[in-house]
Structure formats: C-alpha cells, structure tokens
A protein has these predicted regions:
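Active-site glycine- and acidic-residue-rich loops that bind
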Residues: 36-51, 124-126
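C-terminal cap of metal-dependent C-N hydrolases
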Residues: 75-80, 86, 136-202
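Hydrophobic faces of well-ordered beta-strands that scaffold small-molecule active sites
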Residues: 2-5, 61-63
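A short acidic, glycine-rich active-site loop
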Residues: 32-44, 84-89, 165-171
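His/Asp/Glu-enriched, well-ordered alpha-helical/loop segment
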Residues: 21-34, 55, 60-61, 67-148
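Catalytic core of soluble alpha/beta enzymes
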Residues: 11-21
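Short, solvent-exposed cationic patches
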Residues: 201-212
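Active-site beta-loop-alpha junctions enriched in small/polar residues
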Residues: 7-11, 64-66
Length: 212
C-alpha cells in the first residue's frame, strides 16, 4: 500500500500570504523563513488537501520540522537565494493548528483528528498496538486535551530552539493540558515535569499494522 502525508504549512499558508510577497532584500527578507520543500502553493489547492484528510487519501499530518534560526542561519542566503537553509520549525504547534482548523472549523471530526495524529502514524511506523490505542497491553500514553483553551502562537513563548515561528500570531482554540507517558504524568497543566532520561527504545515491526 501507499501512504501520504501533508503538513500544517501547506494546509494554512500560501503564496498569497503577505510575508511571501517580497524581493528577498534587507527590507523584505521575511520570505526566507518560508523556504522549504515542497514550496508553498496557491491557496486554491488547500481545500483539496483538507478533502484528502477527510477521505483518508492522506493518512498523516506531520511537520517536516527542520528549524534554522532566522537571524544567522537563514541569513546565509541574503546574497544568494540558493544558500538559504531549507526547512522551518513547526513540531510544537502541530496538534493545536490541526485541532483548531480541522475540528474547530468543521474540516473533519474529533475522531479523525485522533486517527491522524495517533493511531495512523503508530500503524504506519510499526508501533501499533503498543502505541496509538487505549487497550489492555498497550502503553498508557494519554493526552488530556482542553478543547476550549485559547493560545496565541509566538516565537516569544514557544519551546523550540529557534527565533521565529511560521505561524506567528495565529490564534488557536484547543491545547494539551496533561500528558501521560507509560502511565506517568510528564506534563501537568501545560508544564513539563518529566524526568530526563526516562525514554525507552521502541523496536518497530518492519511491516506493522498498516500493512496487514
């Protein structure tokens, strides 16, 4: 079988956005933040991506998280576009954006949201049913989600080690409140309280549940 993904930037950003309409000079250098592969397309393509998520033509929403700082690393390409490091940050805000614009705006159901961010990736990567499901014998990995929590995305408050956000100023409704990993509370009321070094190696099947 074949599997496909998209990312929040392709669902929510487009060539028509103002920050991309510059000439890559000192005055209009913001566009360097959005140099990644594949490049952004026209806004008219976005409804088809949402439709693909609803119909399971797209099985996963990832981020292609590849952060380069704007002030020093992206600036390497100021005199030569081809030297702009390719990639952008996004892993921290994936669930917030997908819940707000997916569930909150009626693009898919809450059940489909869970499938896209949990059970489908676990199957594809050969970790199901240890991950991606609440069942006897599975890891007790839980996210308690507050659908009414309001949050404004900003580089000033995010935890990623990068000096900008592709979604700066986006207002979202819905956020993780508590997170349990293997039954242990590691995020409480939005604050990380886990112990360093508690991770475990996950042996994956070469052909996991998605292939069966």
């Amino acid at each position: 079988p074949a599997f496909a993904e998209t990312c929040p930037q392709y669902l929510l950003l487009s060539l028509e956005d103002n920050m991309l309409n510059d000439d890559m000079t000192d005055k209009g250098w913001e566009g360097a933040k959005y140099v990644f592969t594949p490049p952004l397309r026209e806004k008219r393509n976005q409804p088809k991506l949402w439709e693909g998520l609803r119909k399971d033509n797209l099985q996963v929403v990832s981020t292609d998280h590849c952060p380069f700082c704007f002030e020093d690393q992206k600036a390497l390409g100021k005199n030569d576009f081809t030297k702009i490091p390719n990639g952008g940050p996004g892993i921290e805000n994936r669930l917030q954006l997908l819940h707000h614009h997916g569930v909150g705006q009626g693009n898919f159901s809450i059940n489909r949201f869970v499938e896209l961010v949990s059970s489908a990736p676990a199957r594809i990567f050969g970790m199901y049913p240890k991950k991606g499901v609440l069942a006897a014998g599975s890891d007790a990995d839980l996210v308690l989600w507050d659908p009414g929590a309001l949050y404004t995305i900003s580089a000033a408050t995010h935890h990623m080690r990068v000096d900008y956000s592709m979604f700066e100023g986006f207002k979202v409704k819905g956020n993780a409140r508590d997170v349990y990993s293997r039954g242990e509370l590691i995020v409480s009321k939005g604050e990380f309280i886990g112990k360093p070094g508690r991770g475990e190696y996950l042996r994956r099947e070469a052909r996991g549940g998605a292939w069966k």
